[in-house]
A protein has these predicted regions:
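Ligand-binding pocket segment of bilobal, Venus flytrap-like solute-binding proteins
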Residues: 186-254
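A conserved helix-loop-strand patch within extracytoplasmic ligand-binding domains
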Residues: 113-186
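Early extracytoplasmic/lumenal segment of secretory-pathway proteins
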Residues: 27-115, 123-125, 235
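Extracellular/periplasmic juxtamembrane helices and adjacent flexible linkers that interface
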Residues: 271-352
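Periplasmic-binding protein-like
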Residues: 130-135, 200-207, 214, 245-278, ...
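Solvent-exposed loop/turn segments at secondary-structure junctions
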Residues: 51-55, 85-88, 107-110, 143-146, ...
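Short, low-complexity disordered leader/linker segments with a strong preference
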Residues: 1-43
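Alpha-to-beta junction loops
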Residues: 95-101, 158-160, 226-234
Length: 352
């Protein structure tokens, strides 16, 4: 087994362990969100993550625990909470003692940082702090019965659309960003410049056909699985993972869509309070490892590790006109222009 700890890490951990009395306990996970307690020598890491990450983390966390046990002799257990990204960010910023936050978008990590719980530059870790990528796509049932091929098709009469609520869901904000950005791209192609009014109208016409706004991306996906709606706007990985399990969905990649990047960060105040910094840093490093990135890929995500992405690139299609958050001006501008009380999204909701 290739160690995910550096030599320096192993020395530091060994020194730590010689001063601790170890007890043997079974490795496991829990969804209890209380502050952690652990037997002397053992550790509990608290994970606060967005709902879509759960399936991958169900595989990743036990594997990391086994590696850590082999490296250090120490047993790690996990307390895990999975919520809509915005809800999770507010919980951590409000005092939920997560050691690691794995969320849908960097602006949710920024909320925790602004609340004073993340004190380091989390973007300096790994791939700019991002552990996975995806794109915003549309999903239909087998055979694509409504003939959906691009965003414009979602505006047709009789087409029932699903996506979650951007007030609570980071995935929903990616969905809105994708549709609004596609509207900007279309206006730019027609006139040579971005037209926010056109993009807003484009978003309004799609939203007119929305069947429901669920709390999270996972809740929206569950509704679709129960037969609600004709088409779902979601992460590509949500559909690919289900197709791999034999569910006959169709992935519709729009001409213009957004690159999704999902961050993870250590919550400094909490790891220092719990004495779990070394283990938390090792877990975060593990999430960037080839083993972990392959597990993310198995769950439909696009890896951030170049070697792993090269191995699996045949599993993904490249959109004709892929843009990232910088096309919309970055998250700071997007928060103000789209999601502030006077932003485009709330104007669309209010019919202004």
């Amino acid at each position: 087994m290739k160690s995910f700890l550096t030599k320096g890490w192993r020395i530091a951990v060994a020194a730590l362990m010689t001063s601790s009395l170890l007890f043997t306990a079974a490795c496991g996970t829990s969804n209890n969100s209380a502050a952690p307690t652990a037997a002397q020598g053992d550790l509990t890491l608290v994970i606060g993550a967005y709902s879509v990450a759960k399936d991958a983390f169900d595989i990743l966390l036990p594997k990391f625990a086994a590696h850590w046990k082999e490296e250090t002799g120490q047993t790690i257990t996990f307390q895990e909470s999975y919520e809509a990204s915005g809800t999770q960010a507010r919980a951590i910023a409000g005092g939920f003692e997560a050691d690691i936050a794995a969320l849908a978008m960097e602006s949710d990590i920024d909320k925790i940082q602004k609340a004073g719980f993340i004190t380091s530059d989390w973007r300096k870790v790994g791939n700019g702090g991002m552990i996975t990528r995806s794109i915003a796509v549309m999903g239909t049932r087998e055979g694509n019965p409504k003939g959906i091929h691009d965003w414009e098709d979602l505006t047709r009469k009789g087409v029932k659309v699903l996506y979650p609520n951007p007030k609570t869901s980071g995935g929903a904000q990616w969905d809105i960003n994708a549709m609004y950005g596609a509207g900007l791209k279309e206006s730019e192609a027609k006139t040579g410049q971005k037209d926010p009014a056109y993009a807003k109208s484009f978003l309004e016409r799609i939203h007119h056909n929305v069947e429901s706004l669920d709390k999270s991306g996972r809740a929206s996906m569950a509704a679709f699985e129960y037969g609600v709606g004709d088409v779902i706007i979601t992460y590509e990985n949500e559909l690919l993972a289900r197709i791999k399990k034999g569910i006959p969905y169709e992935v519709i990649i729009p001409k213009s869509t957004i690159l999704i990047e999902n961050p993870a960060a250590i919550v400094d105040v909490n790891v220092d309070k719990h004495g779990t910094r070394k283990a938390a840093e090792a877990l975060l490093a593990y999430l960037y490892s080839e083993e972990a990135q392959r597990i993310f890929a198995d769950n439909g995500f696009r890896p951030v590790n170049d070697k792993v992405m090269e191995e699996v690139k045949g599993n993904y299609k490249t959109p004709e006109d892929l843009f990232d958050i910088s096309y919309l001006g970055g998250w700071a501008k997007v928060r103000e222009s789209l999601y502030s009380p006077k932003g485009v999204w709330y104007q669309v909701l209010a019919g202004i």
